[in-house]
Amino acid sequence: MNAKPDIQILTNFLAEYTTAMVSAGTYTARVEKCVDRIANHYGYDVSVTIFVKYFTISVMDSQDNSLRRTYVRKIPLGQVSFNRISELSSLSWQILDEGLSLDEAKESFEGVMSVSANKFASSLILISLANAAFCRLFGGDAGSVVCIFFATLVGYTLKFALAKMGVNLKVQYVLTSFVVSFIAYLGVSYGLTHTSDVAIGSSVLFMMPGVFLINSVFDILNDNTLVGISRAISTGILILCMAVGVYITLTPSSAELLNV
């Protein structure tokens, strides 16, 4: 049986763990269960309240209610990584099943965090291929598929660069959607494709914030209504930003490109 860890050290670890889970794209209930599992193993009670930009974590000694710590942390904007979510969730079970000490748990956590959330090169190629495949699925011709593949390559690279520069997420969506839709428009204007509506409509599909939307539904279903509604509104704003970028492309063209 491991010695009960110091509450300050444990709270620091749980705050870092929660930050990693939320920024990787986890819904609220899963974060709460994993953090609660770890805290209970070390003999502490924990309460986590998650919002869109911040979260609050309170850790209390289950045998001495006067011993407690409360942190408010900002949630950094990170890449969605299902692999990291899975690894962090597995770590919480490993701590419980194998009885890891807090030092061992911190070492395992650092090992998970040392691995890149997503490999840029492989993500770039796979996302570009997937977006081009969607274009073909929706009836795009060969020219549209090529245009969308190239547009996605450029758009994903641009979005990655803007994120590295710390540009506001909404601005990222406006600029990226404008660039990818404009590349698709160039394909139409130069006669590379004859399915203009599919080309321009498909160009921004890779930007859809699907994970955020799904998480908002899960949060509402799990009675985390406040954060669920907040995430849904934030997702709607991002979709609106995408529409603004496409609108900027279509406005100066003075042509009815979308046959709808």
Regions found by a protein language model. Give the residues of each.
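Core alpha-helical transmembrane segments of integral membrane proteins
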Residues: 116-190
